[in-house]
């Protein structure tokens, strides 16, 4: 994923929230994404772990979700 991609993020609520990637930082353990959400237009950092599906918080929004 890259800057300006439309994504959904897993937060403490049950519904994934839609946002836009503002920045990407790569680390050995995974990738951090700064994502602008409606409530947080300046962005919030989310970390996707490399080796864990449970540690995946940011996902690219699919075409079916865009409809």
UniProtKB/Swiss-Prot annotation:
Listed transmembrane segments: none
Q: What is this protein called?
A: Protein DsrB
Check the record and name the InterPro entries matching this protein. Dextransucrase_DSRB
Gene name of this polypeptide: dsrB
Family from the record: Belongs to the DsrB family.
């Amino acid at each position: 994923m890259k800057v300006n991609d439309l994504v959904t993020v897993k937060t403490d609520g049950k519904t994934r929230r839609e946002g836009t990637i503002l920045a990407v930082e790569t680390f050995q353990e995974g990738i951090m994404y700064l994502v602008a959400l409606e409530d947080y237009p300046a962005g919030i950092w989310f970390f996707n772990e490399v080796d864990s599906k449970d540690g995946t918080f940011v996902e690219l929004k699919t075409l079916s979700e865009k409809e």
